[in-house]
Amino acid sequence: VHLRRQRQMCIRDRVYAGHQFGNWVPQLGDGRGILFGQIETSNGLKDLHIKGAGKTPYSRFGDGRAVLRSSIREYLCGEAMHGLKIPSSRSLIIFTGEEPVFRETTEPGAMIVRSASTHVRFGNFEYLCHNDKKELLPELMTHVIEEYFSEYNELENKFELFFESVVRKTAELIAHWQTVGFAHGVMNTDNMSILGETFDFGPFGFLENYQPDYICNHSDYQGRYAFNNQPNIGLWNCQALAAALSPIIEETALKLSLIHISEPTRRALI
């Protein structure tokens, strides 16, 4: 990757909403992360994000910290995904220190610098739609298209083409997951990237032996995010995004894109 130049941007934490285990949560946000930079590279735009930076306005009852154990796991999985040629965020640097972090046990704290093509999530659109901020949807959509889908910028149906691309990228990503036996574990809509990148590594796992109902998240009591249910959840999440975009995209266009989700999945699996 060759660095072309760094873009000027404000250091910020972002608000979003989401469906967590199918339940609507009207406000979430970067509870322990800060987006501090964006660079232009030979592989396109890359966000730079610190995870574990401390409390933000969206930390709720959390301490805003990350632990060394999960930071190392995220680093290793991001590199594994990259090696497998599966779209993924990656980790650049891990910092650790002597200050303890209290979870189920006391653990060493850490911060991780993450790079990703974008940090725009399904949940950013959900937040605007379902919190009486629908008038801001076209502004966010226009910005996202200018940044990441510039080939659609001058087209009249650019919003529809954006959604169709998100659906396709999501389907292809999950198809890649299924081929390598990867279970994400927390496929909430706020953990879904609009560019179809593996994002927000948590209690993920890989199948050691073929076990289609494998559950890697011990908090997933009902198996919502079981390995064999990931394609269904991908579709469910795209439907949630469609609902959030319904004020600015006609229902017929949204439904057509969702109907086509099975075809890119099938092609990717082949």
List the model feature ranges, each with a label:
Residues 1-7, 11, 259-270:
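Single conserved hydrophobic/aromatic residue that forms the stacking wall/gate
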Residues 12-152, 197, 237:
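Conserved ATP-binding subdomain of kinase catalytic cores across diverse folds
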Residues 71, 100-184, 195-258, 262:
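ATP-dependent phospho-/nucleotidyl transfer catalytic cores
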Residues 187:
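Hydrophobic HxD+1 residue recognition
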